[in-house]
């Protein structure tokens, strides 16, 4: 129903601004030659398409329950993340919270993790957090999706009914795949079906490929 592929310009997250938001010792932030930032406790560094935050002093705490983990994650993210991009919690486990970017009231996924935030914490606090290094900025263009570019929901449901354990399927959502074009320095949001299988969202395309090849399905299919 009038689905489109939407293209946006992208920009890097402001690391200095992020560091000032999340570090406790804001007057003691140091930057190394490889752009690693620290206040003597937490460490913030770019790595591929992601930004990695670690706090080694918090690693040895005890595991917290899922509800506590979500609360801790959201409180921490409000310090400096989420300013220009909306996210929602899609996975809540003991000590691990995963949030996906949202777009047009749906969930965004990416093969390189650039549409998700993963937060790991314990009784000592957040000790590792990975987040996107680049965010979409200005709308550029849209292209109508072809009739056969995406499966009909009836086909998706019928395929799942025939080929997977339905008790492992918690949700079916029409989301978006976030895809980067390095040469143009843009990103596109492409409509696609996603299945929540064994507590993790996977693309229907990836799940179908795995099933058709006779591979065993597991939580980490992307």
Task: Set out the residue ranges of the language-model regions.
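Preferential activation on post-signal-peptide N-terminal prodomains/segments
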Residues: 1-87, 91-96, 100-108
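A sequence-composition feature that detects small, non-aromatic residues
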Residues: 19, 66-69, 73, 92, ...
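Generic alpha-helical propensity signal that fires on short helical segments
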Residues: 21-31, 116-117, 147, 211-215
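Amphipathic N-proximal alpha-helical interface segments
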Residues: 34-56, 96-139, 196-215
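Surface-exposed acidic loop/strand-edge motifs in secreted or periplasmic proteins
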Residues: 61, 65, 69-72, 118-123, ...
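Structured segments of extracytoplasmic/periplasmic soluble domains
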Residues: 75-80, 117-120, 163
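Extracytoplasmic/luminal low-complexity segments enriched in Pro/Gly and acidic/polar residues
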Residues: 124-128, 132-222
């Amino acid at each position: 129903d009038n689905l489109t592929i939407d293209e946006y310009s992208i920009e890097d997250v402001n690391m200095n601004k992020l560091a000032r938001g999340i570090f406790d010792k804001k007057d003691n932030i140091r930057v190394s030659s490889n752009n690693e930032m620290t206040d003597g406790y937490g460490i913030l560094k770019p790595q591929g398409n992601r930004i990695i935050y670690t706090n080694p002093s918090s690693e040895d705490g005890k595991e917290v329950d899922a509800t506590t983990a979500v609360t801790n994650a959201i409180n921490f993210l409000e310090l400096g993340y989420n300013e220009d991009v909306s996210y929602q919690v899609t996975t809540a486990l003991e000590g691990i919270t995963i949030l996906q970017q949202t777009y047009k009231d749906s969930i965004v996924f990416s093969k390189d993790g650039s549409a998700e935030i993963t937060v790991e914490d314990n009784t000592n606090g957040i000790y590792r957090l990975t987040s996107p290094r680049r965010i979409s900025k200005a709308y550029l263009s849209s292209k109508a999706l072809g009739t056969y570019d995406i499966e009909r929901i009836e086909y998706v449901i019928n395929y799942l009914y025939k080929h997977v354990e339905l008790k492992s399927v918690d949700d079916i959502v029409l989301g978006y795949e976030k895809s980067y074009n390095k040469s143009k320095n843009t990103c596109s949001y492409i409509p696609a079906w996603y299945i929540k299988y064994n507590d993790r969202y996977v693309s229907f395309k990836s799940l179908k490929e795995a099933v058709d090849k006779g591979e065993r399905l597991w939580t980490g299919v992307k």
